[in-house]
Amino acid sequence: LDDRDYVEATTSGSTGIPKQIKLKKQSMVNSALATGDYLKLSPKNRALLCLPADFIAGKMMIIRSIILGLHLDIIRPSSMPLSLTSKNYDFCAMIPLQASKSLVDLPRVKKVILGGASIDGELEAKLQTISTEVYSSYGMTETISHIAMRKVNHTEVHQNTYKALPNVTFTQDERHCLVIDAPLIADHPVVTNDIV
């Protein structure tokens, strides 16, 4: 919390060599609002931060909590984060490994977004049997975390398709790679190396 209009972050390398970039604070606010609208999060909902805050996923959990008025509990990142708390939560972001090792406790969280890696078939099958609403997210540091989501469970038909968040559009470049246009989040289209 300083008077600069940006936050420095390091990219993961998904669009090239990892590098330091500046993310506009207003863009982070816009991303938080889009997630809140998409997941219907409300002020005073209880959220859990169980990811490192030096990466975009952890940073955005903090920003979402501030902007959306969520009550945020912060615990040490662990492969079994829910074993470190006995509370119930409305919202949490995890990586698939954390979810796979937390299946017994996951129903204590109403909504979970999974990112940072794809969800394998075995985990996807196990997630069908729990009460938690689980979403697979697609995004990167350059897009200030996720810009598309796919509902993993509680659907009538298996969903393979990610749905863009509001004000996000997708095109392809000449290599057939994904180009993300998210004007409320990024000043310029983000060209990925993901073939679509």
Where are these regions (language model features)?
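Conserved S/T- and glycine-rich ATP-binding loop of Class I adenylate-forming
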Residues: 11-14, 47, 62, 92, ...
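Conserved ATP-binding/catalytic segment of the ANL
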Residues: 179-196
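Conserved AMP-binding A3 loop
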Residues: 5-33, 40
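Short helix-loop-beta connector
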Residues: 41-45
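Gly/Ser/Thr-rich phosphate-binding loop
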Residues: 103-155
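Residue-level signal for inorganic ion chemistry
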Residues: 62, 95, 112, 170, ...
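AMP-binding/adenylate-forming
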Residues: 25-30, 46-101
